């Protein structure tokens, strides 16, 4: 079976083509391409501009993907699209494209939960069977464990997502959004040394990030590090008697990462202790961060377990994960009739009935 | 993936010289609980160690460990002073510099509570009811129910005392309640005794709060815990609330808030 997956819940437009061989061989990625809408430094991506970007690119990407995969339209079994969660306007433009292809080619539609897409792709790539999943991206932050046909949310953010916190701090510092604000923060953080005091907000299994963002933004303002025209060379720290000087931009990025990642590792560890699992799978855009992977690795090692993570091809939003999760659902008989092929900004991970797992 | 058997981190200092050495009881995500002795070999004590977390930045790690262990100890000390049934604090070290490599972990030494965890008491009771398979007469059945009701009221009473003292437990489950009783060794198939004081343990997530919302959530967590672990006993949960009312004057407001907390659906949908 072959499926096309269309993803566009945020600023990435992804098209992927997935093959599940009929003889039971492992699934194959035939094509996985992406085009990202990059906003200028100091700005986020607005829904209307992002939707315009997706509309302009979706046909080109589908054509390119079919060419790359060497498949013709007849070979395709179903068209999978992101039903949610995500930004309304970008989701809609991709859903319209999926409907159009479905009517044009006479193929069935499969609406996919974005979070489940990430989880299923992570499981496929890493081969980890029943991990505790940490899903961290620009729009979502959830600790998930599978139990009786649902991906259950053990802990999550109470306000903004962890990636959103990083992205917005990148905006404060006017760090480039190319290739991704979080990536540039990670590179800058490698030069940081001094840990500044930031709030640490874990509430039971849940986390909160908005207060930390406000605190670190406040520090940037206090030390005059925000805004345009600042780079790392211009501010050299002047250490005081205790060796603590005025923090640099790098120090703030470093402290922000250390604090919020500790919170994520802590809640993940609690979930592992609770369900008795030894494996962790990190998915979502923030999952590319090597410091987060490293911290999670140390925690898992101390528990006698291991951590699984994927690289940017599969961590960052992509079309192939939608095709993968869609195809799993399709093979159990799941279809999305045209009249139900809507999309929604709010779509809980545990709303999906996972028929394809025991 | 390494399959090495798990070795707990080395014990912090005075406990490396304890004979017999402390025995590990449970390992949570946050802390290890040991049984050890205090001052003389006849006085058992509970030792809670918070090992340092190597994944965290050392400064952040020290700050969090110190904050949490002190928070726990402060809550316990306050509750002992208010006469609530909780283990007394015997000693603590929040720096945790006593280990062989200087980071054995912060620790808290507490009074040992002899008795059965309430979860086990209920499990045995449910097993007993199941095993008797309806062969109990009406009178015996009523006596059994009366026992459960009594224990439930005891639980409500201690939770009321806790809230009266201005402390929120944060993790009220039947695993964190001990029935202080001499009758520890009941054979299987016998109905467990349910007399004795109920003692609250594990204040790792506790805090001081005077908001009715926090108190209502505390009760709600307990109610949910009964629903998921002791379905047979859940129908007597009303008794917990009765006991709570008797021991805490501000109960009416909290119970009203509890209604709202119950009515709340699942968490609001999360986007961006």
UniProtKB/Swiss-Prot annotation, chain A:
Compartment(s): Cytoplasm; Nucleus
GO biological-process terms attached to the record: positive regulation of transcription by RNA polymerase II; telomere maintenance via recombination; tRNA threonylcarbamoyladenosine modification
Keyword annotations: Activator, Acyltransferase, Cytoplasm, Metal-binding, Nucleus, Transcription, Transcription regulation, Transferase, tRNA processing
Top EC category: transferase
Cofactor note: Binds 1 divalent metal cation per subunit.
SUPFAM superfamilies, per database record: Actin-like ATPase domain
Chemical reaction(s) catalysed: L-threonylcarbamoyladenylate + adenosine(37) in tRNA = N(6)-L-threonylcarbamoyladenosine(37) in tRNA + AMP + H(+)
Positions annotated to bind substrate: 135-139, 167, 182, 186, 289
GO cellular component: chromatin; cytoplasm; EKC/KEOPS complex; nucleus
Domain of life from the UniProt record: Eukaryota
Residue sites binding a divalent metal cation per the record: 114, 118, 135, 317
GO MF terms held by the record: chromatin DNA binding; metal ion binding; N(6)-L-threonylcarbamoyladenine synthase activity; nucleotidase activity
PANTHER family per UniProt: TRNA N6-ADENOSINE THREONYLCARBAMOYLTRANSFERASE (PTHR11735:SF14)
Protein family: Belongs to the KAE1 / TsaD family.
Subunit description: Component of the EKC/KEOPS complex composed of at least bud32, cgi121, gon7, kae1 and pcc1; the whole complex dimerizes.
Annotated function: Component of the EKC/KEOPS complex that is required for the formation of a threonylcarbamoyl group on adenosine at position 37 (t(6)A37) in tRNAs that read codons beginning with adenine. The complex is probably involved in the transfer of the threonylcarbamoyl moiety of threonylcarbamoyl-AMP (TC-AMP) to the N6 group of A37. Kae1 likely plays a direct catalytic role in this reaction, but requires other protein(s) of the complex to fulfill this activity. The EKC/KEOPS complex also promotes both telomere uncapping and telomere elongation.
Protein name: tRNA N6-adenosine threonylcarbamoyltransferase
Provenance organism: Aspergillus oryzae (strain ATCC 42149 / RIB 40)
Curated annotation (Swiss-Prot), chain B:
Gene3D superfamilies the record matches: Phosphorylase Kinase, domain 1, Transferase(Phosphotransferase) domain 1
Catalytic activity: L-seryl-[protein] + ATP = O-phospho-L-seryl-[protein] + ADP + H(+); L-threonyl-[protein] + ATP = O-phospho-L-threonyl-[protein] + ADP + H(+)
Entry keywords, A to Z: Activator, ATP-binding, Chromosome, Cytoplasm, Hydrolase, Kinase, Nucleotide-binding, Nucleus, Phosphoprotein, Serine/threonine-protein kinase, Telomere, Transcription, Transcription regulation, Transferase, tRNA processing
GO cellular component: chromosome, telomeric region; cytosol; EKC/KEOPS complex; nucleus
InterPro entries, A to Z: Bud32, Kinase-like_dom_sf, Prot_kinase_dom, Tyr_kinase_AS
Chain segments annotated as transmembrane: none
EC number: 3.6.-.-, 2.7.11.1
GO MF annotations in UniProt: ATP binding; hydrolase activity; protein serine kinase activity; protein serine/threonine kinase activity
Location relative to the cell: Cytoplasm; Nucleus; Chromosome, Telomere
Keyword Phosphoprotein applies: yes
Catalytic residues, chain numbering: 171 (proton acceptor)
Chain residues that bind ATP: 25-33, 48
Chain segments carrying region Disordered: 1-22
GO biological process: tRNA processing; tRNA threonylcarbamoyladenosine metabolic process
Subunit structure, interactors included: Component of the EKC/KEOPS complex composed of at least bud32, cgi121, gon7, kae1 and pcc1; the whole complex dimerizes.
Summary of the function given for this chain in its UniProt record: Component of the EKC/KEOPS complex that is required for the formation of a threonylcarbamoyl group on adenosine at position 37 (t(6)A37) in tRNAs that read codons beginning with adenine. The complex is probably involved in the transfer of the threonylcarbamoyl moiety of threonylcarbamoyl-AMP (TC-AMP) to the N6 group of A37. BUD32 has ATPase activity in the context of the EKC/KEOPS complex and likely plays a supporting role to the catalytic subunit KAE1. The EKC/KEOPS complex also promotes both telomere uncapping and telomere elongation.
Family: Belongs to the protein kinase superfamily. BUD32 family.
Domain description: This protein is considered an atypical serine/threonine kinase, because it lacks the conventional structural elements necessary for the substrate recognition as well as a lysine residue that in all other serine/threonine kinases participates in the catalytic event. BUD32 has protein kinase activity in vitro, but in the context of the EKC/KEOPS complex, the catalytic subunit KAE1 switches the activity of BUD32 from kinase into ATPase.
Protein name, per record: EKC/KEOPS complex subunit bud32
Protein's organism: Aspergillus oryzae (strain ATCC 42149 / RIB 40) (Yellow koji mold)
């Amino acid at each position: 079976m072959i499926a096309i997956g269309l993803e566009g819940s945020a600023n990435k437009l992804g098209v992927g083509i997935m093959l599940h061989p009929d003889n039971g061989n492992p699934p194959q990625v035939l094509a996985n391409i992406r085009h990202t809408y990059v906003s200028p430094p100091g700005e986020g991506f607005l829904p209307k501009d992002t939707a315009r970007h997706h509309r302009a690119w979706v046909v080109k990407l589908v054509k390119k993907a079919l060419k790359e995969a060497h498949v013709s339209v007849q070979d395709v079994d179903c068209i999978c699209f992101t039903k949610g969660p995500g930004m309304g306007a970008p989701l809609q433009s991709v859903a319209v494209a999926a409907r159009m292809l479905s009517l044009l080619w006479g193929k069935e539609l499969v609406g996919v939960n974005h979070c489940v897409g990430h989880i299923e792709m992570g499981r496929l790539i890493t081969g980890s069977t029943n991990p505790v999943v940490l899903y961290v991206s620009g729009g979502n932050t959830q600790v998930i464990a599978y139990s009786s046909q649902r991906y259950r949310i053990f802990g999550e953010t109470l306000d903004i997502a962890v990636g959103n916190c990083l992205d917005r701090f990148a905006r404060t510092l006017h760090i480039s959004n190319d290739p991704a604000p979080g990536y540039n923060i990670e590179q800058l953080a490698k030069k940081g040394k001094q840990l500044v005091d930031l709030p640490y907000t874990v509430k039971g299994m849940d986390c909160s990030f908005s207060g930390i963002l406000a605190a670190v933004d406040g520090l940037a303002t206090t030390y005059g590090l925000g805004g345009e025209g600042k780079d790392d060379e211009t501010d050299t720290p002047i250490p005081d008697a205790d060796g603590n000087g005025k923090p640099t931009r790098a120090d703030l990025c470093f402290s922000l990462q250390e604090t919020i990642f500790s919170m994520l590792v802590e809640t993940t560890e609690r979930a592992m202790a609770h369900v008795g699992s030894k494996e962790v799978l990190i998915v979502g855009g923030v999952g590319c961060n090597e410091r987060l992977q490293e911290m999670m690795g140390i925690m898992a090692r101390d528990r006698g377990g291991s951590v699984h993570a994927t690289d940017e091809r599969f961590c960052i939003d992509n079309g192939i994960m939608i095709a993968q999760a869609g195809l799993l659902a399709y093979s159990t008989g799941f279809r999305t009739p045209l009249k139900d092929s809507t999309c929604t900004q709010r779509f809980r991970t545990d709303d999906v009935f996972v028929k394809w797992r025991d | 993936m390494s399959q090495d058997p798990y070795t707990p981190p080395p014990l912090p200092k005075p406990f490396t010289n304890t004979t017999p050495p402390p025995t590990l009881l449970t390992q949570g995500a946050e802390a290890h609980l040991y049984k050890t002795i205090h001052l003389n070999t006849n006085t058992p004590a509970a030792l809670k160690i918070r090992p340092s977390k190597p994944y965290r930045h050392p400064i952040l790690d020290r700050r969090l460990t110190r904050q949490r262990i002190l928070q726990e100890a402060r809550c316990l000390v306050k509750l002992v002073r208010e006469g609530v049934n909780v283990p007394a604090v015997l000693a603590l070290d929040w720096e945790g510099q006593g280990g062989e490599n200087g980071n054995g972990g912060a620790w808290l030494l507490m009074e040992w509570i002899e008795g059965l965890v309430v979860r086990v008491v209920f499990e045995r009771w449910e097993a007993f009811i199941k095993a008797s398979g309806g062969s109990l007469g009406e009178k015996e059945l009523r006596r059994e129910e009366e026992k459960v009701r009594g224990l439930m009221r005891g639980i409500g009473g201690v939770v009321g005392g806790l809230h009266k003292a201005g402390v929120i437990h944060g993790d009220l489950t039947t695993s964190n309640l001990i029935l202080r009783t001499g009758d520890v060794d009941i054979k299987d198939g016998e109905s467990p005794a349910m007399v004795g004081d109920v003692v609250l343990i594990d204040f790792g997530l506790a805090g001081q709060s005077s908001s009715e919302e926090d108190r209502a959530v505390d009760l709600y967590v307990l109610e949910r815990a009964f629903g998921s672990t002791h379905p047979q006993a859940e129908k007597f949960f009303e008794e917990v609330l009765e006991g709570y009312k008797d021991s805490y004057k501000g109960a009416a407001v909290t119970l009203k808030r509890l209604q709202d907390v119950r009515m709340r659906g699942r968490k609001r949908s999360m986007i961006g």
